[in-house]
Amino acid sequence: MTISNATQLICFFALSATLILGALGVVLLPNIVYSAFLLGSVFLSVAGLYLLLNASFVAAAQVLIYVGAVNVLILFAIMLVNREEELKVIPGLAIRRFFSGVVCMGLLVILERIATTTHWAQVGPIPLGEEATIRIGEHLFSDYLLPFELASILLLIAMIGAIVLARKDLVDLKPIIEQRIDPKEIKLPSSSMFRKKSKKLTDMG
C-alpha cells in the first residue's frame, strides 16, 4: 500500500465516522439547533467523500447547494420560528424507539446484503477528468432538465414558507382570538421599524 492510498483510506474512515456520528446527532440530540449544525457537518462529510472519488464538481455542488443553501435556510427558519415551549410527552415512546431501531437494523442488513452480492461495474481504464463536468452539465440541462427545475421550485417554496412563518411571529394573534378583531385591521410591522431596531443594535454595538 502506497502513502497516497494509505492517506485516502484514513480520510475515508475519518469522513465516514464524521458522517455517521453527525447523522446520529441529528436524530438523537434534543436541541434542534445543534441538530441543524450537525446536519451541515454531514453534508460536508459527503462532499469530502465525493472528493475522494475525484468528483470535484459534485463535491462543489454538494457544498454550495446543501450547505450553502439548504442548511443555512434550515438554520434561519429554526432561529426565526423557534419558540420556547414545552413538548408533550409522546405516549409509548420506548416501544416506538424499539420498533424504529428494528426497522433501521433491517434496512442496514438489506443494504449490506445488496452491497456484497451485487456485481458492480468495473471502473474504466481512462478517467474522464475535466470532461466529467462538461458531461454532467450536458445531462443536467438536457436529459434531467425537468428534475432540475422541480428542485429549484421546491427550494423557492421552502424559502417562501420560512418567510411566511417568520412574519406570523411578528403579529400578535391574541387580540384576534379573544376580541375577534378583523385580521384586515391589523398592521404588519413596517420596514422602517426593522431599520430603527437594526440602528439601535448597531449603536449599542
From Swiss-Prot:
Family the entry assigns: Belongs to the complex I subunit 6 family.
Name of the featured protein: NAD(P)H-quinone oxidoreductase subunit 6, organellar chromatophore
Organism for this UniProt entry: Paulinella chromatophora
Phylogenetic lineage: Eukaryota, Sar, Rhizaria, Cercozoa, Imbricatea
Transmembrane segments: 9-29, 32-52, 61-81, 90-110, 145-165
MF terms in GO: NADH dehydrogenase (ubiquinone) activity; quinone binding
Keyword Thylakoid: yes
Coiled-coil blocks: none
Cytoplasm as UniProt keyword: no
EC number: 7.1.1.-
